[in-house]
Amino acid sequence: MATVTNFKLVTPPESSRADKPGATKASDAFQEKKSVSVNYDRGEHEVSVNIGGLRKADIPRRYRIRVENDRFQKDWSVSEVVDRLMALNRWEEVDGVLNSWVGRFARKNFPVLIRELSRRGCIELCVNVFKWMKIQKNYCARNDIYNMMIRLHARHNWVDQARGLFFEMQKWSCKPDAETYDALINAHGRAGQWRWAMNLMDDMLRAAIAPSRSTYNNLINACGSSGNWREALEVCKKMTDNGVGPDLVTHNIVLSAYKSGRQYSKALSYFELMKGAKVRPDTTTFNIIIYCLSKLGQSSQALDLFNSMREKRAECRPDVVTFTSIMHLYSVKGEIENCRAVFEAMVAEGLKPNIVSYNALMGAYAVHGMSGTALSVLGDIKQNGIIPDVVSYTCLLNSYGRSRQPGKAKEVFLMMRKERRKPNVVTYNALIDAYGSNGFLAEAVEIFRQMEQDGIKPNVVSVCTLLAACSRSKKKVNVDTVLSAAQSRGINLNTAAYNSAIGSYINAAELEKAIALYQSMRKKKVKADSVTFTILISGSCRMSKYPEAISYLKEMEDLSIPLTKEVYSSVLCAYSKQGQVTEAESIFNQMKMAGCEPDVIAYTSMLHAYNASEKWGKACELFLEMEANGIEPDSIACSALMRAFNKGGQPSNVFVLMDLMREKEIPFTGAVFFEIFSACNTLQEWKRAIDLIQMMDPYLPSLSIGLTNQMLHLFGKSGKVEAMMKLFYKIIASGVGINLKTYAILLEHLLAVGNWRKYIEVLEWMSGAGIQPSNQMYRDIISFGERSAGIEFEPLIRQKLESLRNKGEGLIPTFRHEGTLL
């Protein structure tokens, strides 16, 4: 049986502690009495606060006589009345409870009742009780009641109602005091109405009411939370000029203003000033600094600060916000395991994660498409008694979109509606991306239309998502439609949207349209960035417009836009395609001097440039530089280097590079195989070539027909007909398509070695595959039979060709050769 122990602790209010020993009975009636209940078996404890208030014995005698014999009148304490009111259903009236309460005849109970209801946070119940209170005959309007009501409305962002109470209290002859203005400024600040808050401060000064530090703090917060950090600093300066010194709360609000205004560097500078003034920061201060460091990309400094907070727990102990900020930092860096570890450390230290913490964890999983793990986190949220919000469902929806499950994403969307969670614009954008990124453009457009029907206004992110889907479909008509839809809805495109549209046009091979859109972007004074020029330069190279690509580089330099690795690589590609190796070397050196370390793409572009200009030695030197700088080559770089080895007279190095690719598990491509076969041909390494055929099985389906024909020709030209036929059989088995050119290569080399039987067999294969042999193929075999086959085999060749003609039902042409009719 559970063991329960009850304790009663009496904690007098601050005012009564200063009272004399002969305190009035009324002051004792409003003392807070704490009751503690401990269940040792379950390891639970509960603390409740009870306030008695003025009871039946304390009300005037005329009211006491009136309720003396009425069995419906109850002598409840104030806490009991609050509990009964909270137990009412939403549709039940409060009059039934309040009219049965004897304490209603003591007007001093009214402020305490409003205060206790305000603490519970039930605004609708509090409003109904206040309405009932105002119709009581013994009610007297008081400032403290109105101040509590205005503060409660501010907590729930009911700004208009709070202003209504402000004017109502003046009608009831209650003069607003500093606390009233403080509460109303706080209400406008929460709603982002900082100009209203500034006007209230002016009204306060005109009324000769001296603002307190709390008033200034609320006004600074009103400006700062709206992103107006300059106005917040002006108010702070005015505060010190008026002789009101800032406290730690003021400093935290200023830091928060910098954070809201995205002035992260200024926030760090202000923090240094705080340390110079020996202001001791608290957990809130460090939370803001960690956030700013994360936004500036200084993750190591943020982690150092977090670790120092954990080491000095007595001074500033990390709270849920601190851990959540670090989780978000790891999520942005893509370090999911560390994000999960921080979450588990938070739980291990006894902190209870809130919905924001769970959403940060789900967001980390969603970015990587880990839908199963994200779903399990949602289950943990519900299991711990937390109600998932819109962000939770949006993260889960996004995880399904990233894992290529748009159907599951739509199910989550419908589940949100079923559970009465209204999707916002971010939710719709995630659903549009789920369909668009997986090639379902029609469904993405339908979601866009449904979004408008549901009263959610699309934003520029919605347009960007649709444009990205159009880019995958490679249809310029869709791009035009999306752009016109954005224009008709008054959506102004930003840089990211223009980049998506320009990229979509280029993917649809509409370079002129892309250039026209870029010029429109410049006319509308939308600032282009490095991504814009990367798309234009790479697109121009793809369309073989190399001079135009290079002209964009000069335009970037004129606009003082910093060059990125992608821009340098695209320009290197343009120079290499034109054979301008000197200019390519200049750009490559400029890239290194600018502190932009070349990546594998830049090195590959330079390898192609050296190959095009037949500078094989420099290509080999460049590869050594790649290795020295720790750049891992990819398949394209390896094929370019192999070509340099073959052309530069170092075919043996091709095999060394091939072994390196195997060791580092770099995938082989068709170009790589061709260069290896070329090296085998040069060095007469036919055993290695035959072994290579065995290794080609997994790669054959991905090889082009032109490349397979080249490899067949390489074997045939070297007289390795058996290896050629072996490769041909593997090509057929892999399902790769073959054409007339493939058969022509086989026939040419079979005839060159005198294998006329296989020649005729290949002709039969062609007939069976529905490919009609050319006239020249028949002339070649007939000529071979007459000149080289001898008297013994020439009639046999004619007989087989005649049989083949009969099977082909006239497909084989009849022609005369040296007086002989076939």
UniProtKB/Swiss-Prot annotation:
InterPro entries: Pentatricopeptide_rpt (IPR002885), TPR-like_helical_dom_sf (IPR011990). GO terms for cellular component: chloroplast. Residues 1-28 are annotated as: Disordered. PPR repeats lie at residues 106-136, 142-176, 177-211, 212-246, 247-281, 282-316, 319-353, 354-388, 389-423, 424-458, 459-493, 494-528, 529-563, 564-598, 599-633, 634-668, 669-699, 704-738, 739-773. The keyword Repeat applies. GO terms for biological process: chloroplast mRNA processing; embryo development ending in seed dormancy; RNA splicing. Keywords: Repeat. GO terms for molecular function: structural constituent of ribosome. NCBIfam families: PPR. Belongs to the PPR family. P subfamily. This is Pentatricopeptide repeat-containing protein At2g41720. It comes from Arabidopsis thaliana.
